[in-house]
Amino acid sequence: MSKKLPVGIQVYGLRDLLENTPENFKNVMEQVKALGYDGVELAGLYGLTPEYVKEVLDEVGLVPISAHVAFAEMMEDLDTIIADYKKIGVQYLVMPYMAEEYRPVNPEGFQKFLPMLNEVGKKIHDAGMTFLYHNHDFEFVKMEDGQWGYDVMFASIPHDNLMP
């Protein structure tokens, strides 16, 4: 007998359906579950409390796997972000995007960015969560020394503090 592999959906793709009202969030999550999904990767709290998000996901039967959180938001109030997503039951916080000034095509900005990224990752790891990076094409450019920006990023930051 084969075992069913759980399937999750990235809620970012449904963002236009999510308003800052509990009714829409619950309705969308019910529809996600009805489509056969087992879990979700959140992309913000949509103006809702973490307690309400957890309540809806528990009621509907969806596992909160991870959450995309903008790096700028993490830099502003990481403690609250960690606390909120831990209340929901999220294990993985994902940085979904790298601002242009920090990309490998801007070596000075990229080198400034790496210690900040490591600091955020360490704090997330110390809180018992895992920090992930959602890549795009702009990390895959060669630096002046011939190394790929993506490789430099992951070689510069301990694996406990950042995972691909």
Task: Label the model's feature ranges.
Residues 40, 124-164:
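Acidic/histidine-rich catalytic cores of soluble enzymes
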Residues 53-70, 117-124, 151-159:
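Alpha-helix-loop-beta-strand connector modules within alpha/beta enzyme cores
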Residues 76-79, 84, 97-111:
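Surface-exposed, active-site-proximal loop segments in enzymatic domains
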Residues 13-17, 101-106, 139-142:
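A short acidic, helix-capping loop that chelates divalent metal ions and anchors anionic groups
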Residues 34, 83-95, 112, 116-128:
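CE4/NodB-like, metal-dependent polysaccharide N-deacetylase domain
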Residues 1-92:
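N-terminal pre-domain/capping segments
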